[in-house]
UniProtKB/Swiss-Prot annotation:
<feature type="topological domain" description="Lumenal">
    <location>
        <begin position="31"/>
        <end position="147"/>
    </location>
</feature>
<keyword id="KW-0735">Signal-anchor</keyword>
<comment type="function">
    <text>Component of the ceramide synthase complex required for synthesis of ceramides.</text>
</comment>
<keyword id="KW-0256">Endoplasmic reticulum</keyword>
<keyword id="KW-0443">Lipid metabolism</keyword>
<keyword id="KW-1133">Transmembrane helix</keyword>
<keyword id="KW-0812">Transmembrane</keyword>
<keyword id="KW-0472">Membrane</keyword>
<comment type="subunit">
    <text>Component of the ceramide synthase complex.</text>
</comment>
<protein>
    <recommendedName>
        <fullName>Ceramide synthase subunit LIP1</fullName>
    </recommendedName>
</protein>
<feature type="topological domain" description="Cytoplasmic">
    <location>
        <begin position="1"/>
        <end position="9"/>
    </location>
</feature>
<dbReference type="GO" id="GO:0006629">
    <property type="term" value="P:lipid metabolic process"/>
</dbReference>
<keyword id="KW-0444">Lipid biosynthesis</keyword>
<feature type="transmembrane region" description="Helical; Signal-anchor for type II membrane protein">
    <location>
        <begin position="10"/>
        <end position="30"/>
    </location>
</feature>
<comment type="similarity">
    <text>Belongs to the LIP1 family.</text>
</comment>
<dbReference type="GO" id="GO:0005789">
    <property type="term" value="C:endoplasmic reticulum membrane"/>
</dbReference>
């Protein structure tokens, strides 16, 4: 009887392992299939150099994406990009974030080619570019933050 019970436990264990593997495979398959449409599911940061400076030039950042890229998603994506790309241990970082109040909190893309206006834009640069960042932020009357 003990061997029959052990066989049942092994069989149940194999079922759980197989179910876990199927779930992992389903998640990986979903990630593979949506890789092509990544920006539809996530916010993607777009950037533009403010001026032609050498290394570490100040940037204008904004985020675009699909239905999940509302103003909250845009703000999170921009802040993540600032903290990943600019290291305050190397040199102090200055940035500001400007909200476009004409854009609704939840705004969906108009069509594939046109994602609409961004809800937030940001100007960011290192301390050596502080004049450029402060000038860009002042044109929107935005507060400059320091990291």
């Amino acid at each position: 009887m003990a061997t029959q019970q052990n066989k049942n436990r092994v069989y149940i264990l194999l079922q759980y392992v197989l179910a876990a593997l199927v779930l992992i495979a389903a998640v990986e398959y979903f990630k593979y299939k949506t890789r092509i449409s990544y920006e539809w599911f996530h916010c993607t940061v777009q950037s533009e150099e403010l001026f032609d400076h050498p290394e570490g030039s100040p940037l204008k950042l904004w985020a675009i994406g699909g239905p999940s890229c509302d103003k909250r998603g845009e703000l999170k994506t921009i802040m993540k990009r600032i903290t990943m790309d600019f290291d305050p241990n190397v040199e102090p970082v200055k940035f500001c974030i400007v909200e476009d109040t004409k854009v609704k909190s939840i705004h969906y893309p108009i069509e594939d080619g046109n994602k609409g206006d961004p809800g937030y834009i940001s100007f960011v640069g290192y301390e050596r570019d502080s004049d450029v960042v402060e000038q860009a932020c002042a044109s929107y009357a935005a507060t400059v933050f320091n990291l």
